[in-house]
Amino acid sequence: MLKSKFKEKFIERYIKLTDFKKFEEYSLKFLRRSIRVNTLKISIKELKNKLKDWELTQIPWCREGFWIKHKTLERRDIGNLPEHYLGYFYIQEAASMIPPVVLNPKSNDLVLDMCASPGSKTTQLASMMENKGIIIANDISHDRLASLGINLQRCGVSNAIITLSKAQYFNLKFDKILLDAPCSGTGAIRKSLKTLLTWNPNSIKRLSNLQKKLIITAFNCLKDKGILVYSTCSVEPEENEEVIDFLLKKFKNAKLEEIKLKIKRSPAILEFKNKKYSKEIKKCLRIWPQDNDTEGFFIAKIKKD
């Protein structure tokens, strides 16, 4: 019998949460390549005409998103295409396109992308806003800001201000906030098997504590009636449902909203390690890799009442 690439403690945990054989199968498969058309520079129709050698399949939950495959050759090097260098499209995993779609920023909004690097979601937000309004694209890592700046420039983003700061120091209130939080990446194992080597329960606990601090900061930065979207590419309950449950208990004016998308979803986890979470968390979107053949993702939409 072949030995699993997953640690024993990992298997013990996940076998209680999902169909582990399916999770393992999809986590060890190559991701389908996907792109998002950058409508700041080109229309969907125009890009399709330029990529005639490539088969583009619509991603149901994102109008500008497509899975991409060469019609005749076994090519995966879409990053080398001139259209990519010119910023006509962004190479972005299909599930990663969901949080900006859920946030749904308008052209007159003041938006905070709290952990913005390397910029996939920032550029998506800018495209949705048609380069209007203002995006504060923030990160606390100086090294990561370099890639953010390059991607914003390549994609022709002109409504974003890059900041290197902790969000609690902003003397601003935002209409919309995206908190795509640092996480364990357990939903994105198929992108990097290194995740399996670095995974351990102690690091999950540390990340959960950080995420709780970040979501409190984000909620405090939100205007009344504003919208906060929290997301991770983790499938750990402690990084997802537990963080949202923590926020709901701390702020009575934090209200979860339903997420309605054309996507297969799995039930939110309402109990883990003898902890019971609010039934409101059923409104969150939990996606396992096997649900839609994507990365695993978790998304919550919160309104400040």
Roles of regions detected by a PLM:
Residues 1-305:
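S-adenosylmethionine
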